Amino acid sequence: MATRRLPAVTQTDGSRTATESGVPEYEDQIRSYRNDQRRRHIWAGRGRRLLSIMPGVSSSERTLEMQMNPEVQLQRSMNHRAEAVPAEVLYRTFHGSVNHRVYSHRSEERMMVVNGSQVDRSFIQESSFEVLSRTGIEFIHIGVMLVRIQILHRKFAGTMALIVFRDTRWSDDRAVLAAMEIDLSEGNQIVYVLPDIMMTIKSFYRHIQICVMTKGYDGWQGEDNLLITRGLTGRLSNTSNVGFAYDVKAMVEHLQSNGVKAIKGEKWDAKRFHNGQWNIEPSKVVVPMQPTEMKAVSNYDGTTSLRFSNYAAASTSKPPQYNEKDEEINEDEQEINHSLNLILNDEESTDEDEEYYQYQRYAWSQVGDSTFYYDTDGVWEEIDRCNDLPEYVPSETSTPTIDESEAIIDEFLEHAYEQRCDSDESLQSGDPRKYEYPTPQSSPEHLDNESRSRSSSASSTSMQDDVEEIVRLMKEMRMKKQKKKKAQQALSSQAQEEPIIEENIEENKQAQEEPTQEEIPTHKENQPEEIQNEEIHVFEEEPAFKHLAAQLSELVNMAESSGQSGVGFQPPVNAQPDVNMEGPAGYAPATSQATWSNGVNIPVKSANFRWKGPVGNFQLPSAQGKDGAMLVFGMNYSPEVFDRWASITRNYISSFNFNDGGDKIAWMEDLLGETERKIFVSWRMRFKDEYQNLAKIANQDGGTQAILSQIRRIFLGEDPVLGQNTVQNIAFRKLKQLVCPNYQSIRRYLMDYLTLAAETGLMWSETEGPAISEELFTKMPAAIGERVAQAYKIMDPTSAVNLPSRVYFTINYLTEQCKEASYMRSLKALDFCRDFPIEGYYGRSGEKKKYTARKATKYTGKAHDNHIRVTKAKYQRKCKCYICGQEGHYANQCRNKHKDQQRVAILQSLDLKENEEVVSADDKEEEDDEIFSVLGEEDYQEETIMVLEEDDIQQIIKEFSKFGDLSRRNVGPNFPGPAEVQMGVLKPKSSWRRPIQATLEEINCHHNWTAISTGQLACRSCKQFLAGVQCHHCHAVYCFMCAEAYHDVQAEKILSKDYSFSARGKKGKAVIIEEDEIEGEFLISQLQQENQRLQKQVERLQEELMKLHREKDEALKHSEKASRVFSTIQESDEAELNLIKEELRQFKEETRMAIAQLKEAIIVQEEDTIEERCAMILEEKHTENIYSATAKAEYNGLYNVKVGIKPDNMEPYYINAIVDTGATACLIQISAIPENYYEDAKVTVNFRSVLGIGTSTQMIKAGRILIGEQYFRMPVTYVMNMGLSPGIQMIIGCSFIRSLEGGLRIEKDIITFYKLVTSIETSRTTQVANSIEELELSEDEYLNIAASVETPSFLDQEFARKNKDLLKEMKEMKYIGENPMEFWKNNKIKCKLNIINPDIKIMGRPIKHVTPGDEEAMTRQINLLLQMKVIRPSESKHRSTAFIVRSGTEIDPITGKEKKGKERMVFNYKLLNENTESDQYSLPGINTIISKVGRSKIYSKFDLKSGFWQVAMEEESVPWTAFLAGNKLYEWLVMPFGLKNAPAIFQRKMDNVFKGTEKFIAVYIDDILVFSETAEQHSQHLYTMLQLCKENGLILSPTKMKIGTPEIDFLGASLGCTKIKLQPHIISKICDFSDEKLATPEGMRSWLGILSYARNYIQDIGKLVQPLRQKMAPTGDKRMNPETWKMVRQIKEKVKNLPDLQLPPKDSFIIIETDGCMTGWGAVCKWKMSKHDPRSTERICAYASGSFNPIKSTIDAEIQAAIHGLDKFKIYYLDKKELIIRSDCEAIIKFYNKTNENKPSRVRWLTFSDFLTGLGITVTFEHIDGKHNGLADALSRMINFIVEKNDESPYRFTSSVEDALKVCNDDHGRNLISAVINDIITVLRR
């Protein structure tokens, strides 16, 4: 037996083993600080620094991360315990162990944490808190915390966990100390946290918690799945300085490793949870609290109520324990029941520590079922007591000698920095060695030396000092050990004389339960030396102990399990993850899981079933109190009985106060019936602990509900308030099975359905709620259910979840049906009608039948199907039934089942007299006067336009009154009047409320709410006179509930800024009266002012009357003179009158002669036309001319349409689409739409087609789609890579057609959608990509036109004189020259071809026949291109065709004359363009540019030298540009002309170059225009432009620039002096275009393209060219007839005489005149300086026109003309505040000036109204009378004449002119018409 000295260790409660989930095994240790261990840690560091300077030894710094090696700890945790950082490493040495202690904690707990759940735990347990409280220390410092997670299932299961360390003292995200997401694939992980926090012990226990959540446990059906280990090292202190010695740079250090691998199975990864989101719920850890304040209240019955407050954390006290002598055991003397899991990890630990750890191993062996020993690595390891504990061999002494101590010190100095593997080898060597544990002491010198050593450097001087210090300290230690040796020897000798006591198992157990003083180590400071040196008895345990302990543990578990209550008190829990049961008492909804089922089918024969009503007629007996009731179930043992009793009891008990919870439960116990009370009392006696828990919270908030819930669980086994849903699931199953089979049970079915739905708790659920509401109708009998559902949808179309509303509506609907049935039954016999004559009854003529009988006129003895014989009723003749063919009865008496149903339908709809009958008509009827024919009536509906007159205003007021009272209080200055009311729908926030109708002004109003008191005004929604709010702007009135529901107005906010209702009280009416008085005074003042004005006017008229009297008197005086003068005047007037009549007669005669000549000319012209047509047929021949190689639109024979994709809050994006009724869904090419327009689809969709199977994972975002001129809801459109034909980018399939819920009609190229009655025009060719829409030109056509005119350079002399330096610098710069490749290296944008199918080989057809001239020209062009290094020889597999054309014009540099037939080399890239994705970058609007630059004063224009060649080709795209020229193949190094994406790429480049200079630089492809107001500004702007060109490598053409000119030609227009006109070369191109070219489709298309430049200068140009454009259609007539040539000549004549247009100034007023007919529309934009200026000052600035296909009605044409005109002229009026629109359509004027409600065609008016509203400016409409619109009317008739092609057109034109002459009464109109007639005659003669 050996005797040892024990260290000073204070141990607390022993370890506790978890017997069930959620009960942790925990260990704590509170001990003194080991100063010697700190010294060894410091010495080891100094030794390492000393070794680092020695030669041959590598320098290495040992950090805290190295000491906490995560790889080793994670692998060690599979066999031993993972270790944390020793306290002696984290903290510095302190004097006085009373104020400082080291605290270590370790606990393990198994738990089940699955998806949707969150587990919160305090970091330490309640028992640990009690131990810390008994130490008397105030503060704790948290040094390091660790959490280890071990999974309790297979590895690689694809699971993940979240660990959150948090401080719940914070209420926001600052509560999170650290968090880590852990992948559990390898099985276990460790998380270390160093928070460096100091707090009180109470705060530490209450607020430092961990939160655990998991993912990937879907389908987990086991119990516990995780084992959580927690460890802590901290310092307890009563001072503010805890000596934390580690520099924490980061709050959390997460050290992870791969862990241990196992046998491979099917691996699941956790990648699907990466970047996921964790939702942390509030902590649910319950910490015992105790009050600190009390308040006493005396009750009315003499009792006293006590109320406690200001609760704080409380340490619960355990019941006292007694020993064998019946003496109470002090807690401070109890044996420790749990130990520390965080042990020093110091590989340099000396043998002196082994004595302490040997003692620890023995001490723990006496405590619990397991033993812990400290191995050579410093790890606590748990081993089995009887098998793994080494046998103790007693020795005489365990204290080493002085020589041994010196040897140890020398060994330490020599091997101070050994590797960790040496320690591992010593671990395997056998039993640990035994050394004396020295008494820890500290001195100031040691602390000072320690401080010096920590701050010393690595120099040689400091190292020498360290060595001296180490030697001195070791000498001190050697002297101390010599003094202790003698005391140890004396203790050993005394221990040898005492016998060894062998103890049995019971004695061991008793020793464990009642530890003696000899077995409990205490602090050295408080014990004498002889007690510290007491004996330690070590014995070997008996082998049977383990078996007996297991049996004893099993018995204890059985006893504990039998003592648990199956209906114990439970707090509310979340039965479902998405159901929150916190707050007031709730009701958990049902789940979708299956509940119990009967499982047995009982045969039903003749059982007497009864209907169970939703409300039982049971009554509970009185409790003989005021209002209480007794709970007696009786025969009605159902939850309804308990719910009723609970409601009564809850209200009854709310008026009483109780001293404690026990009294409250006892009082409620007396409310139970006899049997029920016995049941409850037996439960209370059996489960006392649960009853005590219930009593603790019974008198708190929610205590009454807790008692009721417990009683319900006792009697019914569940409670929905606690989140349990057994009853709800049963009700949900019954609800799904409930069906109403017949009409008689509808009322009871409704009650059952409502009751069961309420019991499920899912009535208002977002998932199940809509289905429950809709199934109410579907489970009713089919006929009545569908009708009720349709009626409810009409009444409330938006409410998706509101079952009570549907039940109430169904009851009212069926009640009305019963009333109607009763009424119809009472009117079954109408015999009384003969005694009551009525007005307005004119017989049966108004009740038209579908068929009528007319006397047959073509009956020849052969009876047809429509022939009948009508005879008198009761005619005594043999007759044949009309509907069955049998003889002997009439049709109305026929009972034959085999009837002709067609004849039955005819007979029912046949209009006959009362005494007539119908019989069959046979062949060869003798009395043919009775034979009649049945005629059917065609239904038609004539569209009318209804305009509300003044008489309809009262009806509008009546209709509007149901949405709100139109009292003077509600109608304010901003409220629309009766004729202006426009209604809309105001939707509530909640889905169960109905939307209400409100004015558009109220919906769009920015409300300013003010509170009003009760009884003042009625609410707009509920019509109640309640307290609410009123808006100052729109005067809308709502109660507080409706205001919150419809306008999100909070009552608290309104009341906080308004005075209270009690303060207003009686002032409400006074306010109204005061406002009435103010308004009355205002009216009186207005009347007085008007009266004064009238009085002044009367005085002025009286003065004028007096003046007239005076003049009359003077006139009478000169009467004689006047008579003489009068005769002379009369003669002269008669002569002048005769002269005027003669002139008028001559004018009419000339007009008649002109008309006659016109008729003759028309007849002659028609004869010439016939001859020309014959000649064209006889002399027709084939000619072939090549003008250009422009790619035409691809003909595919499909329904092509251009659509706009417009997601919400985004601009529309236009693409080409086809309407395909054979496609199932809508698809779009992924390369045709920007990425931000589509999103990831919820599911992956597979599509099957003839090309194979395709997959889509993206879809277009929600929004709208623009088809034609109508927006539709965006259908579900999937985005994928499709192999579509060239030009097609989208397929509109049946999913869009089905979503319309209407019809679809296809007629030729017109598609009509019947939901919104929208017609769109399609084409059989694809839309040309990147076409210039304003000019209707392709890019190549535009470039050809622009290149055909040589623009000579121009330099203004005055500008050159002022800017001589700038021009000199321009000449010296090389970026103005002939070489476009000069600065090619500065090119920042390259041309890359996005090829659709890279496998396609481009094989252009070579030219077979080449003339020598073309071959020579091509060789010359190729050599020039090779010299410029823009092309190179190619070896590409692709091949396009190049050829020479001679078109366009050029200027001879010698003669200066224009030379036609300029040779150009053209490349046919048609096949390449078809295989290239389109670039959707749009070109800027020409009209927008012109309107922006037109008002400037000085211009400069530049063209790029071969602009496209200044863009380099991507190297990978170069082979695709290969072309065949002659017999050789070449490829482009620059972007060539002819690529369809070239203009878009070049425009993007130019926009990027000149970005930010839009205010003075306009760019359109390669044209650059600089515009300024002054010459000084222009110089600065030119310098900026030239610098940008130099930076980006742009080369300007020296021969095509104009600088400093006041007029400029740009984009086909001549600008200058605020005027705009068509360029002369455009006019010459249009007028000089040869007829031979016009006769070909290519020539006509080119001519129409050039004519597009003039569309803004010619009125109604769209109507004129419509017949010509029809010839360009694939199915149009390509031949030119005389009418066509007339139109061409007329257009050329108009182009020659184009007027100059004048751009409006900035402050001008804009007027737009519009006109529309069935085939087209036209608009004119005018301006004047002020709105009130006369019309004579108006100037024209633009024209616009277009055609309609298909034709439109008159009203639609006028509306569309106004809409198109406003759209075309936006650039002129968007910056204005007001606008005038003139139209000759009176219906539009009345519509806009009155209202657009109740129109027969709502779509047209709503579209028109929406367009005007969206302008954002004030629009005023004016009507143009016919007498002021003579020219427009004549032009319209002329256009109609040109378009018409029938034989009656000349005569109708003549009559039109005559009608125009009749309406024009003034000279101006007659002159205009005469001029028009002369022009027409001139055209016809040509």
UniProtKB/Swiss-Prot annotation:
Give me the Gene Ontology terms describing cellular component.
Answer: host cell
- Swiss-Prot/TrEMBL GO biological process terms: proteolysis; symbiont entry into host cell; transport of virus in host, cell to cell; viral penetration into host nucleus
Q: Name one GO molecular function term.
A: nucleic acid binding
Q: Which residues bind Mg(2+) 2?
A: D1715, D1833
Q: What does UniProt say on post-translational modification here?
A: Polyprotein P3 is presumably proteolytically cleaved into several chains by viral protease.
Residue limits of the Reverse transcriptase domain? Answer: 1425-1615
Domain of life (superkingdom): Viruses
PANTHER family in the record: POL PROTEIN (PTHR33064), RIBONUCLEASE H (PTHR33064:SF37)
Name of protein:
Polyprotein P3
Please name the source species.
Answer: Commelina yellow mottle virus (CoYMV)
